[in-house]
Amino acid sequence: MAARVLVIGSGGREHTLAWKLAQSPQVKQVLVAPGNAGTACAGKISNAAVSVNDHSALAQFCKDEKIELVVVGPEAPLAAGIVGDLTSAGVRCFGPTAQAAQLESSKKFAKEFMDRHEIPTAQWRAFTNPEDACSFITSANFPALVVKASGLAAGKGVIVAKSQAEACRAVQEIMQEKSFGAAGETVVVEEFLEGEEVSCLCFTDGKTVAEMPPAQDHKRLLDGDEGPNTGGMGAYCPAPQVSKDLLVKIKNTILQRAVDGMQQEGAPYTGILYAGIMLTKDGPKVLEFNCRFGDPECQVILPLLKSDLYEVMQSTLDGLLSASLPVWLENHSAVTVVMASKGYPGAYTKGVEITGFPEAQALGLQVFHAGTALKDGKVVTSGGRVLTVTAVQENLMSALAEARKGLAALKFEGAIYRKDIGFRAVAFLQRPRGLTYKDSGVDIAAGNMLVKKIQPLAKATSRPGCSVDLGGFAGLFDLKAAGFKDPLLASGTDGVGTKLKIAQLCNKHDSIGQDLVAMCVNDILAQGAEPLFFLDYFSCGKLDLSTTEAVIAGIAAACQQAGCALLGGETAEMPNMYPPGEYDLAGFAVGAMERHQKLPQLERITEGDAVIGVASSGLHSNGFSLVRKIVERSSLQYSSPAPGGCGDQTLGDLLLTPTRIYSHSLLPIIRSGRVKAFAHITGGGLLENIPRVLPQKFGVDLDASTWRVPKVFSWLQQEGELSEEEMARTFNCGIGAALVVSKDQAEQVLHDVRRRQEEAWVIGSVVACPEDSPRVRVKNLIETIQTNGSLVANGFLKSNFPVQQKKARVAVLISGTGSNLQALIDSTRDPKSSSHIVLVISNKAAVAGLDRAERAGIPTRVINHKLYKNRVEFDNAVDHVLEEFSVDIVCLAGFMRILSGPFVRKWDGKMLNIHPSLLPSFKGSNAHEQVLEAGVTITGCTVHFVAEDVDAGQIILQEAVPVRRGDTVATLSERVKVAEHKIFPAALQLVASGAVQLREDGKIHWAKEQ
């Protein structure tokens, strides 16, 4: 793909946009209209003589010149509706519509909008009568000293007065003397806010907000923020005054609310949204919204963008920004300083020659032109703001020093510029500040907020003997008040194990707390103890309030269910101990029983006693390391529908079914005296837990045909090909607890258990157990599990699960967004698919395709080709990982590397690629452009086996796509992608199922009709 892009505008911002767009390998030419001397002839960049005010003529120009994308720099064309007009004419245009651009073009609209959507801003009133405005200024109960022209005034329509009289004079100048023309027909009078002013910008596709690093502009002409207001005399980025946490707050409470609000009001906002923000003592407040890049903010933000700007803009227009989030250069600062003409912002001289460009560029600086023109082959001044000099270095001080060198090199008569750009950041950075606990990664305020949120949850678990009041050093429990006379105490501690990993992958944290409580209170119930109180331990690297609150809310609800108090706990934030998003849990329960009620009563247990099994809710919290391994090898993801017969839920939800708590239902039965022992079936399964409550001389014989085995166990056994012993030693197999009772009382106890709403069965009996004999024998287990997962028809077992011949293990190689990867992921989730994706490899880090894979629970690897001397070494590294994952088939989905001969030969007949044309026509990387230039009416896409010659492998499937009149590379590409998403999965299914094979003679063989 080799696109042509048109940038609208003539300033330093537009030169910067053109410079950044020209860096894209997908862009072959950037035209700028009307442009300046810097964009006249600079590599891919040149100026275009086309009227930008006549939108019809502009649209025709774009069609004639095959422009793929129009990028609008200044605000005036946006307010004039250029985006809507070009879009209606079939030209892709980056920026908000005129309706959405009212956020900038009408300050009155913007203020009303912010009030409607609770976006923090200064107090204000709008006026069309100057007398009313002045009356408000003198009577307002806040300092009403900021006067703004409501319309567009080239960034200069704001006057910050020092007194009420000065504010009233500003009103007169704007409304009566028309200092800003029609823009001042309505004025907005605002509260004067105090604090640091910063610029926070974002890309948005109308849903997703991708924030940029915060910047700070310098509006006043002279050092020390003296002199008149200008369009901006310099900027730096990132602004250290805006911490990461504060930027998140600004994103959520300002930028995202604005985007969501525009969507709700029927004017979806797409493009750049710029919020000018004051950092007040009451938090960030919006001063103004702009609907485009600021100038000079653009000149310091875009040099820090690592991503392809063209790609980001196209993804934004496609509504796919979430899959192509921009990546920024970290641990670097950018500074830009504006050089202006003498007399600016008033009258100034034009036509003054500028020298020193080679010297500035030799310093490694970027010089962006603004008010410049070419005259007799020389660069001369033609505007108030003439040049911006941008330096990027590892820190702000170094960037400032480099920018000053460029200013010294560039010369024109009467040049003025500020020498103190960044002075506020310098002062902020040099301010003596001792380290805080938060600097080390521990946020005490967040911890306090968590305690405040969970206090009512814990309070609700109070019970006789304990009134919960979090915040003390320890908790107290009054055994006497709880009704105990001669008690023994029992305690137990446990965790949830790697079930946590699944909860974190599924982003489902509300049920894991019940697992923690259940594991502890069920253990002490085995001693006959009533659970009295519970304490939790939650540890993480970075406290996420919503996640932690969800976990602890689950713990509190489980404590209420168990009848114990959530007496306290510990939330430990330990930076660098855990990866982002991960946490660990541990619990501690204390219970009590009267001395004569202690279990197990070993002396009472005799041969012939009955074993009653109480149903589990599912897997409970054991065996999850094996479960995760089985899922990894299976054709399902955690987000896939659960196997047949397991309910209308995802596999992740099925596996996260919380552990059953037995204390409330079984404690009265245990206290009746009829129960001799209670075994909690936890780690070690049936084989290792029941013997823990039996005398050494006894064991048990169990019959699995007597109880209901949940279908999840059948799926695990079949998918993992697990042996009967492995099942019995790892899982509870449907029995969460076992009671030992006298044979003659079994029927009564079983009746009582069922009356307490527990599902239960007599599942076996106590038997004598000679030394060295198995203490638990389970008959009919594998038969019951397999029958349970199958349907019997005509005397044969038919699987009720999508168990089929072994599925092909697929690896997908990517370099970018991975839209075809998503199609492959979606198709292989189908239970009928003959393949499943086990690995995604990218030769580039931080690309959207990796995020797609991780969201689907697919392992990923990044193998950077730049770290290898040649293609063969890189391919060997890839091959090693493919072998590690036992890959059968390789799919190339936007993988931008030519593979070496040895690698291709090894994977001959097992490696698929998709090409965006009907091969053998239009080979190579710019197929769509070739199609359009050839004037054909049909194109399409082709899935083929990979051969050593590029795009020359045997064809598996093709799909035709019409070429329509007026198509651009972008529109044609989108239409072809739809076809790609259809036939790539279909071709993979053909190869994985064996329907299509590559013969030894290099020809396609169809094993069966499709």
Swiss-Prot record:
Residue numbers of N-acetylalanine PTMs: 2
Keyword Ligase: yes
The protein's annotated pathway: Purine metabolism; IMP biosynthesis via de novo pathway; 5-amino-1-(5-phospho-D-ribosyl)imidazole from N(2)-formyl-N(1)-(5-phospho-D-ribosyl)glycinamide: step 2/2; Purine metabolism; IMP biosynthesis via de novo pathway; N(1)-(5-phospho-D-ribosyl)glycinamide from 5-phospho-alpha-D-ribose 1-diphosphate: step 2/2; Purine metabolism; IMP biosynthesis via de novo pathway; N(2)-formyl-N(1)-(5-phospho-D-ribosyl)glycinamide from N(1)-(5-phospho-D-ribosyl)glycinamide (10-formyl THF route): step 1/1
The enzyme's E.C. designation: 6.3.4.13, 6.3.3.1, 2.1.2.2
Modified residues (N6-acetyllysine): 350
Modified residue annotations for Phosphoserine: 10, 440, 467
Note on cofactor: Binds 1 magnesium or manganese ion per subunit.
SUPFAM superfamilies the record matches: Formyltransferase (SSF53328), Glutathione synthetase ATP-binding domain-like (SSF56059), PreATP-grasp domain (SSF52440), PurM C-terminal domain-like (SSF56042), PurM N-terminal domain-like (SSF55326), Rudiment single hybrid motif (SSF51246)
Protein name in the entry: Trifunctional purine biosynthetic protein adenosine-3
Gene designation: Gart
